[in-house]
A protein has these predicted regions:
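Hydrophobic anchor at the start of a short beta-strand
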Residues: 20, 63, 88-89
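Stable alpha-helical elements in mature extracytoplasmic
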Residues: 1-8, 48-52, 76, 124-127
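Short C-terminal domain-edge/linker segments immediately following a structured domain
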Residues: 23, 52-58, 120-127
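Acidic/histidine-rich catalytic neighborhood of metal-dependent amide-processing enzymes
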Residues: 1-47
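Short amphipathic alpha-helical segments, especially helix-boundary/capping motifs
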Residues: 25-30, 51-55, 101-106
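Active-site-adjacent mobile loop/cap segments within catalytic or ligand-binding domains
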Residues: 33-38, 46, 67-136
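Acidic, glycine-rich loop-and-strand cores that form catalytic or ligand-binding grooves
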Residues: 43-65
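Sec-exported extracytoplasmic/periplasmic mature domains
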Residues: 10-14, 54-57, 61, 82-85, ...
């Protein structure tokens, strides 16, 4: 899992690369997707995570960005933090009602553009752009 982020974490594109924080967008376009506090993000990038959820609330997207704890996911953000010490937030739709924790189309042939929701992408995109734009 996460071979690209593990490689980049060990061998960054610029020697000694650092960033204030990172944002991982994973499965952020699904219909009726909601985004809870991911456990590893909360543990290692809590300040950045709070900025994101606060911006979503400010923009009127609190129905997408739920201020409650969600699951823990081993994903690229873990290795960005582990190898580069860059706090990284995973914005991910984690479905507690699913056997896998993810959308039923996850890793199937049905994981296609027909299952992407423009409103969800807009909520996530505008939130992330707001956070980036407001960084000093």
């Amino acid at each position: 899992w996460c071979l690209g982020s593990q490689y980049w974490g060990r061998i960054p594109h610029v020697p000694d690369y650092k960033a204030r924080f990172g944002i991982l967008l994973d499965m952020v376009g699904g219909k009726n997707a909601t985004f809870y506090y991911e456990a590893f993000s909360k543990q290692t990038a809590n300040n950045a995570m709070k900025k994101i959820w606060k911006m979503a609330d400010h923009l009127g997207y609190s129905n997408y960005f739920i201020k409650e704890d969600g699951g823990q996911v081993t994903d690229d953000h873990v290795y960005v933090n582990q190898y580069r010490q860059i706090p990284c937030v995973d914005i991910i739709h984690y479905d507690t009602q699913s056997n896998t924790g993810f959308n039923p189309t996850w890793h199937t042939l049905d994981d296609s553009l027909e299952n992407i929701d423009k409103a969800t992408l807009q909520a996530v995109g505008q939130t992330v752009m707001g956070v980036i734009y407001n960084e000093k």
